[in-house]
Amino acid sequence: MGKLYVVPTPVGNLEDMTFRAIRVLKEADLILAEDTRTSGILLKHFEIKNAMQSHHKFNEHKTVEGIVNRIKAGETVALISDAGTPGISDPGFLIVRECVKSGIEVQCLPGATAFVPALVASGLPDERFCFEGFLPQKKGRVTRLTSLQEEKRTMIFYESPYRLVKTLTQFAEFFGAERPVSVCREISKIHEESVRGTLTEVIAHFTQNE
């Protein structure tokens, strides 16, 4: 029986790719990529020429059975996403769950993920926190925010820059305008930035500077 490797890839800076991640990808029989075009650039940079197949939220329910069967037959499969660690607000959970059900060994390599550096650099309490990822766009959004109104721990959210001010404004409505917040963007890139302050202050910053 083969094995499934979950391989983190850089969230911005290619120097964050680990030696082990490169080796695993070069040794894999098949690389599952969220977007083969995006991952193709990464693989080309590190001279990785192994077979690659798209694996994303729109096709994973159809392809997971075939992939599991290939691993059962002895193949080594590596799963990557466009950036960061697969399964963290990215495809990955479904195939990992099915591999575990089938008794297939799953190894997740340590490596890049966006929320850890953002949290540590925020200056907000990080000994206890809750990760919420992306909020629902429509249905369930208000319900989710309402359920979090009494949450005292540091909460971590992902958001598109195009929806940032709208989401921060909702946070002020549900969590209080004076709640401290940190917005981290362009993580590990040249223009990395963390904007810290109350929700009122940070909303004003991005309203004026976007």
Please place each PLM-identified region on the residue numbering.
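Class I SAM-dependent methyltransferase SAM-binding "motif I" and its flanking Rossmann-like core
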Residues: L94-E151
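Loop/turn-to-beta-strand initiation segments
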Residues: K3-L4, A73-A78, T154
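Glycine/small-residue-rich loop that forms an oxyanion/phosphate-binding "nest" at active or ligand-binding sites
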Residues: V64-T113, P117
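Short glycine-rich anion-binding loops that position phosphate/pyrophosphate groups of nucleotides
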Residues: V11-G12, D82-P86, P161-R163
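Glycine-rich, flexible N-terminal cofactor/catalytic loop recognition
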Residues: M1-F58
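Conserved helicase motor
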Residues: Q53-K62, F134-P136
